[in-house]
Amino acid sequence: MQRAFPLLLFALAFSSLPAQEYTLTPDSQPQDGVPKGTVTKFVLPPGKYYPGTPHKCAVYVPAQYDATKPTPFMIFLDGSQALGNAMRVPVVFDNLIAKHDLPPMIAIFIDPGILPAVLDADQNRYNRIYEYDSLTPRFAEFLLNELIPEVEKSYNLSKNPDDRGLSGVSTGAVGAFMAAWNRPDQFHRVLSFIGTYVSMKGADALPALVRKTEPKPIRIFMQDGKQDHIVAAEPYGTNFSGSWPINNQVMYEALEFAGYDVKFEMGTGGHDLKQGGADLPDALRWLWRGYPEPIMVHEPAGTGQPGYDAADRVFSTIYVDKPWRQIGGAYGPIFSLTSDAEGNVYFADSRTNAIYRADADGNVTRFSEPPSDIPILRVGTDNRLYAYRPWKDEIVSSNIAADMGSDEKTVAHGLGDVVDFVVMRDGTIYSVNGQSGPRGGIIRIDPSGETHSALRWSDLGAESIMARNLALSPDQSMLIVSDANSHYSWSFQIAADRSLVNGEPFYRLEVPEATVRGFALGAAEDTNGQVYFATPLGIQIAMQNGRIMQILNPPLPGGGPLTAITFAGTANANWIYVAQDGKLFRRHVKVTGANAWTVVKPPKPTL
């Protein structure tokens, strides 16, 4: 109740002000002596992403276009509207390019798709909400793989993401923002007019996601009006999905919190383009200011100031100037990563059946060539490398100083389709199979090699669990089980007799919009008891209390899910390694990873 009163006052303030009169400036009027660009219309035929659905498009080309040079460009959603009198984009571009306020750039206009009805008596299917309101990467992939290549047939478009911008109005603002959010390797500039960041199809959740997620190199201009879906009798909003002014404000605050280069113009108008059209020239100047300087990620403006709360924020884990770096080459799918006390990382290449080692300096060399595929590796406290052999259904160990196969010992066999295992300091091993249903569960292997059924999913009434990874807490008192089948992962207490007890679906992960599954394919812990889950959204970092507090971006935007994760280092385990699309990446971090040979009691969690 304490927050409701201020928000009500906020809403009442919106409804009590008369709408300001907005007029187009000379920058939106044709000017004598200014070179005029050309606009060519075309229809993009149906393709893979929106089957059977054509899109009406147009391309503006400035008079200064030079076909020998890669040209910056912007894509305007609801393209016919952007071409119309409310925005007059070609006129604005002509004037700003002539003033050198914009570089010579192409504008691509695209309308939302309409699936034609089969019969005249039938209704068309209108795709605007499906395309623009979606949080999935589908629309971004459509732009990158269908629209842009079509325009590139005629024009030399830049591939530099700093040269690429997006603009959207209302629901189109969500589409523009999400295309850049999902593919920050492709788009760095966004115009958002009267954005629909409300509960239509999930955009109301974006501010929370923005606050948690490592910032991306995107510059955003936002505009809304205090009477956007607001009337005097309903200052809290007239639409079922929420309040446009409040949600735009919350979105802006989230972007500021995360450290984005963002500007927000809150006017007095409604859900229209009166202010947006008048603001467009200055918005474009702001969006492209400093060009061609690259758009970079920065820490939030309040960093280091008195009262600044740095705990639990992304930059308490990572360095702003130390991004992911690929090491080694291209391999087959990498299903596990493990490290030793010297900071070396080991992984198996499923394509060549070879085991590779990355040293502390990031140099990757072939370590050994076992006779067949070994997907899972773990380093134990006895300086031995443990491996699972699926063709024999056994775990073996070898001296880490020798090739796999020499000095080899069989640890256990008959384990049943193992997808991961962990080795404790006392030599106890927990292995998990990839089966769901009554056959799915965890096996405990004593140091003597004797095996025991430690847990069956059916014992928990959770037969849908599809475990993919195990991790130990830094004090080795808890076993974390990542579940690829839901957005929860489990925490089990390790009893004195090494049985697993008191299991709970403790960690609630964020999931990709296109699925209800979390697809957590890896997990690791730091010495503070925080869990790092490898997921399609990136590395989701859970506080010791179970909350997801940070999400680190994956190395390859638009790539496949992260398939493995580990910490490594020398004096401290201060590197984090992940595998994605058969490639190995690492980055320097501010935290220290937990390992099998050093047992550390984590601090009491925040409650």
Task: Describe the function of each predicted region.
Residues 563-607:
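Blade-level signature of beta-propeller repeat domains, shared across WD40, Kelch, NHL, RCC1
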Residues 301-323, 500:
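Blade/loop signatures of beta-propeller domains
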Residues 329-344, 370-389, 413-441, 459-478, ...:
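Beta-rich, blade/repeat-based domains predominating
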Residues 344-369:
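Beta-propeller domains
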Residues 399-403, 491-500, 588-597:
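Short loop/turn segments immediately following beta-strands, especially the blade-tip
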Residues 20-302:
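Non-catalytic cap/lid and distal C-terminal segments of serine-dependent acyl enzymes
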Residues 325-328, 365-370, 406-413, 452-459, ...:
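Beta-propeller fold detector
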Residues 350, 390, 434-436, 484, ...:
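Short loop/turn segments immediately following the C-termini of beta-strands
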